[in-house]
Each structure stands twice: as structure tokens, then as C-alpha cells.
Amino acid sequence: MNKLHLVLLVLLVIAATVCTPLVFAEGEIPADVSLETLDYIVDHSAQYEKLRQAKIDSCKALIASSDDISKSGLYNQLFGFYYGFQSDSAITCARKGLEYARKCNNKTDEISSIIHLATLYQVTGCYFDSKRLLDNLDHSQMNSSQLYDIYSCYANIYDALEQIACDSILAEEYTANYNSYRDSLLTIDPENVFFRTGILVDKGRLVEALQTMKPYCDSLDVNDPIMGAAAYVVSGIYREMNKTSLEKEYLIKSCHSDLMHANREYISLTRLAEILYEEGDIVRAYNYLNRSIEDASYCKALQRMDMAAPMLSIVNTSYKRMNSRWLKFLSGISLSLIHI
């Protein structure tokens, strides 16, 4: 074997050792939850997005063959498929649903479409536009499901405003409003495990919060779309407890679920990348943060982009330094072998 072949062989062995990926069949959804399977899902997101797109295409075909009376409800259904996936398209669906609801004098669907618009405005950072739409609605005309949605939207608006408030008095006001709407949600759905857990966390009763949420999360199938949110809440409790390894375990579960269901409006992957960076796993942290930014940008989830962007700058610098050292290392090996 000549020197050049020996150099190439050594470099290939090193590359294979560092970069060997998991391989799954086309369309297969890996059931085990680990960083390795998460790597696969991140790298092969297109196949999971195809599954969601198929539902969208099916609903579009149904709308095309339906009468005007049915279209407002079908557009609201299509909104659900686009929500968390493509915000621009979701807004279009909400507007089309509103148009047909008003055309057919369907008050229930009209209210649902307005709430959908307000929800999208909140996700994309238009908090006061969202609130303006909600403030103009007559709550007496709403069913319990619509009240639940409107209170959820109000709560999310005030939660987001509290996080960006530059005035402590304003922040306290936003927090009080958030708590008020969360309490209203509990009157509608007193058994809601998410809200009950949130109240326990706010009171510092972390063990009780964990005992409330963790069994529920662990009972979910790994393919259940609720897993993303449930696992993230559990990870947050472990974070408050300073139990990073357990926080990381549930963040991986949350990311697995969100990405597998092509949900682009998430936060778990950003937090997981932060932990991986602190552990020295620079390559994964870099890849995960880039994916977070891309998804948030595509979905126009402004708050998610704001959360991920500062961390990306730090990780990006470390990634470039690591690559520079890696190239120097490979060059050193090459030169050593050439002189054998």
C-alpha cells in the first residue's frame, strides 16, 4: 500500500468512527428515544413533513369539492394542519374560513376563525394586534371550546409580554393578567394536568408538580403528538430542580415528538442544544440550533427565533474553532503519514 492510500484509509477510518449515522427504512419512524434517533429525525425531516403535507393535500381536495356552507368548517380544519407548520398558510386558512363563515352567516365558525387569526398573530409576535381581535369578541356568544381557546391566547400573549417587558411594574401587571386567564382556563377544564402543574411550579411545589405531570407524560405513547408539550413541561421541572441529566432525557423526548410530527413551533430543541454545548457536544449543539432557527423562521415564530439566536452566535463561534482545530489535526496526521 503506497503512502497516499494509507493516508486516505486513515482519514476514512477517522471519519467513519466520528460520523457513523443510524439508518432507517424510508418512512420509518424510530420508536426509541435517544440522541442518535434524534440526529436521524433532524437529518431526515423531509420524510416526516411529507406525512403532514399529505393530510393538508387531502383536506384541500375536500374543500375544492365542497359547497360554501361546508367550507368555513373545513378551512378551520385545514388551519389545524398548518398551525405550527406554515404560519403564512395558516393565516390564509383562517381568513378564508372567516370569509365563508360570514358569507353563510355561520357565527360559530366566524368566531373560531377570528380566534385562529389572533392565535397566529400571537405566535408571530403581533401581540397587540392579537389582543385587539380578541377584545372585540363577544364572550357570551362563545361555546366552552372557544372560551378555552380565547383564554389560552390571552394567557400566551401576557406570558410573552412579561418576558420582553423592560419595566418591572409592567412585568408584574402582565404576570397578574396571565395568572388570571390561567385561572379562567381551570374553571373550564379543572382537571387539565398542564395548568395544575403550572400552578404548582409557580408556588415552588416542584415535587408535587413532578408527581402530577410525569406519570401523565410517561403514560403517553412516543408517537402521541401531545408528548412534545408534556415532556417539555417535565424537563422544565427537572431544570428547576437542577437535575440536568433528567431534564436532558425529557427534552430529547419532546424534540423527538415535535420533529416527528413536523411541528416547527417549539422550544425544546433550543434548550437541548444549550445543554449539549455546555457538555462539549459542539457539533450536535450547532446542528440543533441551526434547525431551531430554520424552523422558527419558516413558521415565523418570532419568540422562538429570539430565544435561539443569542445561543447560536456563541455555538457558531465554538463550532468554527473546533473545525479549525480538527483540520489542523487531520493535516498533521497527513503530513506524518506522508513522511513514513
Where are the regions a protein language model picked out?
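Membrane-interface helix-start motif
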Residues: 316-333
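Bacterial N-terminal signal peptides
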Residues: 8-18
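Bacterial N-terminal signal peptides that target proteins for export
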Residues: 1-8
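Short, intrinsically disordered, charge-balanced linker/junction segments flanking boundaries
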Residues: 184, 332-336
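A "functional boundary" signal
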Residues: 19-321
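Conserved small/polar residues in nucleotide/adenosyl-binding loops
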Residues: 338-340
